[in-house]
């Protein structure tokens, strides 16, 4: 993947983790 794609994926994963920890509203 291009570097910017990797950064996006990392930030997206971090966001999912944060939302998941806030009572799973993402799911």
From Swiss-Prot:
Subcellular location as annotated? Secreted
Q: Report residues binding Ca(2+).
A: 14
List required co-factors: Zn(2+)
Q: What biological-process terms (Gene Ontology) are attached? A: proteolysis
Q: What class of enzyme is it?
A: hydrolase
Note describing how the cofactor binds: Binds 1 zinc ion per subunit.
- The Enzyme Commission number assigned here is 3.4.24.-
Keyword Transferase assigned to the entry: answer is no
Q: Does the keyword Zinc apply?
A: yes
| Protein's job | This carinactivase-like calcium-dependent prothrombin (F2) activator activates prothrombin via recognition of the calcium ion bound conformation of its gamma-carboxyglutamic acid (GLA) domain, and the subsequent conversion of prothrombin to active thrombin is catalyzed by the catalytic subunit.
What does the subunit section of this Swiss-Prot or TrEMBL entry state?
Answer: Heterodimer of a metalloproteinase subunit and a regulatory subunit comprising two homologous disulfide-linked lectins (AC P81798).
Designated name of the protein: Zinc metalloproteinase multactivase catalytic subunit
